C-alpha cells in the first residue's frame, strides 16, 4: 500500500446477499426488500493519485462505457462541490477482479470506494452518513459499502442495521451468462409479497432469495450451476445473480469442492467479513498519515477518532 499523502490504494470488495426477500413494491417502481449483506475478501483494487488540474480520469477505459456513465466517475462528481480546493483533481486506476453482472455489487463497491477515498484526499470532511446519502442516488447497494459493516437492510437496501455474522469460507461460482436485473424485477411471476421478518429471525433462521426461481427460468446456465452446487449443501443466489455461493466451515472443504467445479464456470474461494476491507485499509492509511502537518487538516472527521 502506498502511504504517500497524495496517493492511496484501496481494496473494493464484493458483497453477498445471504438472503433476499421482496416485501412490496413502491409507487416509484422500486421494490421494498429485506436482506443480510456480508462482505467477502474478493476485491477489485483502486489506486488514487491526487492532482491539481481539476480533472477526473479513470483508466483503463471500459469499452462501450462512456466515462460519464462510469459509476466511479459519477461518485467523484458528487463530491466535487465539497472539495477543499477547487483545483483538486484525481487520477484513478481500476484493477478488476470481480466479475461484472454477478450480483456481488462490484460497480457499487467501486463507487463507494471512490467516495471514501476522495472524501479524504479532497478534504471534503463529510460524515459516512452523508456519503451514503449521496451514494444511494447512484445505486441502492452503495450505502452498505460506504458504511462498511455487515448489515440487515430494509427499504431499497439503504436502511441498515449493523450485525455480527459468522465468517465462513464461501465457494463463489459465476456461470457464463449475464443476468438482466431489469428483466428479473419486471417479471410478473416474481414474488413481491414475502412477509417482513424481524432482524432476530433473520440472524437465527436466515431466509431465501425471492429472485432465484425467476433467474433460473430466464438463465438455464444459472439453473445448471445451482443444481450442481446444491449437491454439496445449501446453495444460494446473491442479488439477482448470476453468482451462486455455498458456505463452508473450513478452507479445505471449500477448496475441495472448488477443485471439482466445471471449468466452464469461474470460481473463487473467499472469506466472509463483518468489516469492509476498504475501511480497514483506509483507516490504516489515515493512521499512517496522522502526523503529516499539511494533510492532517484535510482528513475526514468521520475517520479521525
From Swiss-Prot:
Pathway membership, UniProt: Isoprenoid biosynthesis; isopentenyl diphosphate biosynthesis via DXP pathway; isopentenyl diphosphate from 1-deoxy-D-xylulose 5-phosphate: step 3/6
EC class of the enzyme, as a word: transferase
Binding positions (ATP): 99-109
EC number(s) stated in the UniProt entry for this protein: 2.7.1.148
GO-annotated biological processes: isopentenyl diphosphate biosynthetic process, methylerythritol 4-phosphate pathway; terpenoid biosynthetic process
Transferase among keywords: yes
Protein name: 4-diphosphocytidyl-2-C-methyl-D-erythritol kinase
Amino acid at each position: 500500500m502506498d502511504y504517500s499523502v497524495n496517493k492511496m490504494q484501496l481494496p473494493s470488495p464484493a458483497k453477498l446477499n445471504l438472503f433476499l426477500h421482496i416485501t412490496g413494491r413502491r409507487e416509484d417502481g422500486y421494490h421494498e426488500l429485506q436482506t443480510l449483506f456480508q462482505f467477502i475478501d474478493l476485491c477489485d483494487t483502486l489506486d488514487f493519485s491526487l492532482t491539481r488540474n481539476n480533472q477526473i480520469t479513470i483508466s483503463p477505459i471500459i469499452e462501450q462505457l462512456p466515462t460519464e456513465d462510469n459509476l466511479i466517475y459519477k461518485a467523484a462528481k458528487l463530491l466535487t462541490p465539497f472539495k477543499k480546493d477547487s483545483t483538486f483533481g484525481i487520477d484513478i486506476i481500476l484493477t478488476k477482479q470481480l466479475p461484472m453482472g454477478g450480483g456481488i455489487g462490484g460497480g457499487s463497491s467501486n463507487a463507494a470506494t471512490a467516495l471514501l477515498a476522495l472524501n479524504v484526499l479532497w478534504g471534503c470532511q463529510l460524515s459516512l452518513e452523508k456519503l451514503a446519502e449521496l451514494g444511494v442516488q447512484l445505486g441502492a447497494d452503495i450505502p452498505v459499502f460506504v458504511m462498511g459493516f455487515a448489515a440487515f437492510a430494509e427499504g431499497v437496501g439503504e436502511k441498515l442495521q449493523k450485525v455480527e455474522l459468522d465468517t465462513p469460507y464461501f465457494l463463489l461460482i459465476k456461470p457464463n451468462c449475464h443476468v438482466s436485473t431489469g428483466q428479473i424485477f419486471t417479471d410478473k411471476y416474481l414474488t413481491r409479497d414475502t412477509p417482513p421478518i424481524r432482524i432476530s429471525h433473520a440472524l437465527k433462521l436466515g431466509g431465501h432469495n425471492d429472485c432465484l426461481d425467476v433467474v433460473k427460468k430466464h438463465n438455464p446456465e444459472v439453473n445448471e450451476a445451482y443444481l450442481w452446487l446444491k449437491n454439496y449443501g445449501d446453495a444460494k443466489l446473491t442479488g439477482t445473480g448470476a453468482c451462486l455461493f455455498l458456505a463452508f466451515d473450513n478452507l479445505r472443504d471449500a477448496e475441495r469442492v472448488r477443485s471439482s467445479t466445471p471449468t466452464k464456470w469461474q470460481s473463487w474461494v473467499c472469506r466472509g467479513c463483518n468489516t469492509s476491507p476498504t475501511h480497514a485499509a483506509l483507516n490504516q492509511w489515515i493512521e499512517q498519515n496522522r502526523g503529516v502537518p499539511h494533510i492532517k487538516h484535510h482528513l475526514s472527521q468521520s475517520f479521525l477518532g
